[in-house]
């Protein structure tokens, strides 16, 4: 069956999640997205009664970008579809291609435009999918990369659906041919600086001459890879269920896995945390370093803003630059007093209760600061004074989080460490008024 409004409806029924609140077509002004919008408009709102609108992102890179913008406006007026035009400028980072920067900026705008539960529709077709797989293969991608583009994924406040991913480009072109408003040809499609354009103009014709069905074959291979990735994700989730130890992973458990399953489990763990996983080689080398280290070492591997850290027999994922308590600050020694400790550090609050710090013995204000080294404290129900360092080691406070611990002083005397320990010499007597230290919204420290 060739592409039509009816075939689009069938694809939308299958791929648009239940509960979607509307359809948003990403309209470039090219033939493919114009055909998709025309087919969606032909449904006349009959698909689940969902409203339809379009968004055009003008990044100004094409010499004819104004023509694209006007073509989009003309088409939407012709079809009776509401259009939003967003203008942006592109600034590629060092080492980043203009092609990648433009794509990322465009998707960032589209993501921001989505209202809750709206579905973004893009006109990626079978040829696009085949090209994506081939480009990923040339870059040495793994199974996930070779899955190319998913048909549906969570995106912003809603979803991103590619309803024509298995449709030949020729069918989209044929469907869009009768449109009253002609689409604009993108001159950037002839710019060989871009990898996809180079592949499309110089490499693809040679491959297609030898293998005429190459787009269908590669798109089918991408589907097989997507199914394989589902199995890898399921295996990773099953392994993580056995490996999880609080917020960390068990080092002995990781060691017991085969190399391939270990890599897969950690990659899945990183994905679930929203972290961009490095290459398999980098993950493998990082795991080798942290797993082979002696138990008394504190190996860590930093990737951008994140770090893998091992403490004793657990592996943690943390920020590369852990939060650190700022300079010393004052906290009124009164019930209800609260001190914000800074970003990602929560707040200290004093609560009236029997027990805790002896309210009558405290000065008007308490001093809160991070440890400087050498601090000691005699914990309640302990027979001797101990160093804060020793107490942290005994409790298993993560070494990289110890500078986040708020130490509470009455003058020069350390009276409490967060809500972990209170000095016995400053504890309220039975029945006497006391102030308990609460660390609210505290970061993970053990």
Per-segment meaning from a language model:
Residues 1-210:
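Core alpha/beta nucleotide-donor-binding catalytic domains of modification enzymes
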Residues 182-184, 213-218, 232:
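Short, structured loop/turn "capping" segments at alpha-beta junctions
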Residues 3-32, 49-53, 59, 88-92, ...:
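AMP-forming adenylation/ATP pyrophosphatase catalytic core
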Residues 189-196, 217-226:
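Internal, active-site/partner-interface "lid" segment
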């Amino acid at each position: 069956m060739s592409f039509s409004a009816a075939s689009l409806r069938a694809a939308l029924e299958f791929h648009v999640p239940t509960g979607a609140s509307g359809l948003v077509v990403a309209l470039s002004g090219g033939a493919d997205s114009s055909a998709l919008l025309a087919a969606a408009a032909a449904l006349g709102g009959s698909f689940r009664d969902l409203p339809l609108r379009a968004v055009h992102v003008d990044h100004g890179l094409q010499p004819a970008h104004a023509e694209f913008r006007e073509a989009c406006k003309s088409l939407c007026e012709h079809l009776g579809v509401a259009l939003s035009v967003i203008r942006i400028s592109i600034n590629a980072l060092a080492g980043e291609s203009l092609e990648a920067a433009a794509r990322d900026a465009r998707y960032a705008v589209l993501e921001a435009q989505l209202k809750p539960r709206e579905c973004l529709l893009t006109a990626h077709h079978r040829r696009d999918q085949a090209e994506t797989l081939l480009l990923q293969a040339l870059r040495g991608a793994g199974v996930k990369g070779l899955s190319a583009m998913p048909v549906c994924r969570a995106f912003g406040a809603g979803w991103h659906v590619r309803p024509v991913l298995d449709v030949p480009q020729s069918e989209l072109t044929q469907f869009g041919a009768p449109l009253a408003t002609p689409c604009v040809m993108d001159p950037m499609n002839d710019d060989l600086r871009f990898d996809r354009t180079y592949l499309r103009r110089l490499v693809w014709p040679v491959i297609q001459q030898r293998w005429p069905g190459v787009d269908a074959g590669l798109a089918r291979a991408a589907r097989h890879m997507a199914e394989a990735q589902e199995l890898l994700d399921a295996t990773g989730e099953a392994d993580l269920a056995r490996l999880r130890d609080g917020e960390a992973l068990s080092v002995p458990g990781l060691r017991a896995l085969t190399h391939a399953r270990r890599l897969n489990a950690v990659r899945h763990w990183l994905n679930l945390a929203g972290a961009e996983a490095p290459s398999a080689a980098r993950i493998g080398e990082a795991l080798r370093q942290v797993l082979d280290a002696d138990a008394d070492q504190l190996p860590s591997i930093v990737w951008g803003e994140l770090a893998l850290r091992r403490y004793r027999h657990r592996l943690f994922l943390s920020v590369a630059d852990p939060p650190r308590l700022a300079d010393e600050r004052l906290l009124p020694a009164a019930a209800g007093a609260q001190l914000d400790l800074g970003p990602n550090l929560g707040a200290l609050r004093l609560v009236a209760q029997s027990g805790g710090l002896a309210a009558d013995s405290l000065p008007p204000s308490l001093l809160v600061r991070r440890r400087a080294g050498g601090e000691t404290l005699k914990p309640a129900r302990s027979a001797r004074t101990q160093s804060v360092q020793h107490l942290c080691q005994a409790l298993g406070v993560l070494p990289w989080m110890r500078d986040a611990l708020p130490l509470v002083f009455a003058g020069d005397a350390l009276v409490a460490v967060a809500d972990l320990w209170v000095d016995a010499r400053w504890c309220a007597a039975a029945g006497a008024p006391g102030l308990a230290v609460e660390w609210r919204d505290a970061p993970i420290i053990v």
